[in-house]
A protein has these predicted regions:
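Acidic, serine/proline-rich intrinsically disordered regulatory segments
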Residues: 2-258
């Protein structure tokens, strides 16, 4: 699921929004609220799980394990008789949640690598293109392509190994998690070929990926419920941004990807 600030950005002007590679929703803060998460549960999770189980000739019974984030409503526990929804204990996400045991880290690494690869390719194909223009050309449509391709790159062994702490009996080999060191090294090598990133190092990349995760707090949700929550229908409605002087030092690499 991807939550954006606009229901139909300019980059999707000629696209069918029902055939995007992600479950697409929007609000003016680009936050996953309880309403959006319930929408995902009903219109994405349930149909896809049902389709998968039919392909495997399995009965429609499923378990959804989620953390206690403010945007995850407890009412989901009673929404479908064939799906059991369980919430993890508070403050255990980083320790137990399967996605936090290697899957998210692998996805982030693949996404960052593909982003730098795309930028470098564009610069090589058009010598007159500046790095600033290259970043500006990276719109939400290209972002979704990267998201889909990065998710597809996550190996089944990585997904299997993520259950090591909660369900070790089903893990085939706990050492099968993707070699992130290799991927991070590849990112550094690619980034250093881009003008302005020649001083990027492993610490910059690893810190950037660690800072991706910022869960909503209760205060965040209170703010979004107290202010108008309707997403922009189109990016035509957005105010024109003032030009920002580009900073491509290693210290600014995190901000570029946020």
């Amino acid at each position: 699921m991807v939550v954006y600030k606009s229901l139909k950005p300019l980059a999707f002007k000629s696209k069918d929004m029902n055939h995007l590679p992600v479950f697409w929703r929007a609000n003016n803060k680009a936050w996953v609220t309880a309403q959006i998460f319930s929408d995902w549960f009903t219109n994405c999770f349930i149909p896809q799980v049902e389709m998968y189980l039919k392909l495997k000739n399995l009965p429609f019974k499923a378990l959804l394990l989620i953390d206690n984030a403010p945007g995850h409503p407890t009412s989901l526990k009673f929404q479908h008789s064939d799906i059991e929804v369980m919430f993890m204990p508070p403050n255990t996400t980083s320790l137990l949640q399967p996605l936090d045991q290697g899957v998210i880290a692998a996805f982030k690494a693949y996404y960052v690598r593909r982003t730098f690869q795309r930028l470098l390719k564009n610069l090589e194909e058009d010598p007159e293109l500046t790095v600033t223009q290259g970043w500006k050309n990276y719109d939400i449509a290209k972002c979704l392509v990267n998201i889909k391709e990065s998710l597809d790159e996550v190996q089944p062994s990585t997904i299997n190994a993520c259950w090591q702490k909660l369900w070790p009996e089903v893990v085939l080999k706990s050492d099968k998690i993707d070699n992130l060191n290799t991927t991070v090294n590849q990112i550094v090598e690619i980034a250093r070929n881009v003008k302005g990133f020649d001083e990027v190092n492993r610490d910059d990349i690893e810190e950037m990926m660690l800072n991706y995760d910022q869960e909503l707090t209760l205060e965040d949700l209170e703010e979004i419920t107290e202010t108008p929550n309707e997403p922009k229908q189109s990016e035509h409605d957005e105010e024109e941004e003032e030009p920002v002087k580009p900073d491509f030092s290693s210290k600014s690499i995190k901000e570029i990807f946020h």
